[in-house]
Amino acid sequence: MDPNTFPTKGNLILAKNSLKLAHMGYELMDKKRNILIRELMGLIDEAKDIQRQIDVTFREAYAALQIANMEIGITNVQTVSYTVPVEESIRIKTRSIMGVEIPLVEADPSGQAPTYAYYSTKESLDQARQAFEKVKDLTLNLSMIENSAYRLAAAIKKTQKRANALKNITIPHYTQLSKDIADALEEKEREEFTRLKGIKQRKNKAS
């Protein structure tokens, strides 16, 4: 038998303190869950908006690319594409939301000078290049948001599990334990009162 369940005043204080801490823990978990859910909902809305922008920009980019293919030839467009440098400026940092590490993706802004001569190409190629650069920036942002949303969803699930354990197991346990110890102490006090009353009555009779 757990010594902490013995009906003593010390154990009653411990049980009540544990119950108080469990309630505080549940309130904190519930608050954290609500904050994370709000953050997640905001990210979901943002991801939908960025995805729409990507879809529109992709269509614009491919339309411009098709025109460029017709105007200067597919071979020339491919040759120009080989001059596009590999993206090496991507940096990943993190920030914390209620203890959840969220990625921050940074990169040098697009829109740098083209790697080809203007006189040898057409405006359609410039439009395609600019659109694809915009798609790249949007995709980087979307990847950051989707990864953040995944981490928040996992944290929400974990937080909900802890909150449920406090609400359905820990709090009822210490509520019942406090009641049982208090009832047992009260019963002891009644028995002691009855015993002392009996002793007093016997003394009165003897005198």
Question: Which residues does each PLM region occupy?
Answer:
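Charge-rich amphipathic alpha-helical interaction elements
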Residues: M1-S207
